Amino acid sequence: TEPGETIVKGPAPDAVTPEVLMDNLRRAMRDRDKDLYESVLDPSFWFTETDCAGDLVLANGFEQEIEFLGGSRDGSREGIFDIFREFEYDFQLIQEYIELGPDYPEAFEGDPDGHPEEDWQVFRGRVQMLMLDENGDGFRVDQIMTYKLRLADNGLWKIVRWIDDPLSGDCGAGKRLTKRYNWSNVKLTANR
């Protein structure tokens, strides 16, 4: 493409495979597309991030996730997609596997990790994000993340769990050489 040339994209394809879903996630993030982002999430979506001690940093469900990224449904609050003019997102696959349902019984009623009746496709990898506002200020995220996908009743794949690993620099006694943010920190800071 030539400088200044506009690229017109067609609608995102239906997530009929886990790979298409992951491509749609990438596209939703890079294009800051609220509707596409919502379409990749399962209604029972659950996000968690813990620190190195295993303590919960952040946990949120579907509606709060939509508000974090897309803003409030009534338009009274901006989301991350509104705040930043540039959003780079890259996922580098480390491991792909299937969680067999019988191996994941519900530990308690409503357990977001229990899925004894269905198998989930899992993508674990390194995610790098760069978010910049109109002043060039923003956040850089470089973190290991795990996405767990389920096949919905309509035949489309959806993200049902998103689990962020603690930042490796937070686990040891060493000092970080650069300022990096975990995804939970960005979600909470940008939505103040």
Predicted regions and their residues:
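A mature extracytoplasmic/lumenal domain signature
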Residues: 41-44, 51, 125-127, 163
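Sec/Tat-exported extracytoplasmic proteins
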Residues: 25-33, 41-45, 69-77
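Short beta-strand edge/turn micro-motifs at domain boundaries
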Residues: 1-7, 111-192
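Short, low-complexity N-terminal intrinsically disordered segments enriched in polar/charged residues
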Residues: 1-31, 39, 50
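A short gly/proline-enriched turn/hairpin at secondary-structure junctions
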Residues: 46-58
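Surface-exposed, charged secondary-structure patches
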Residues: 57-139
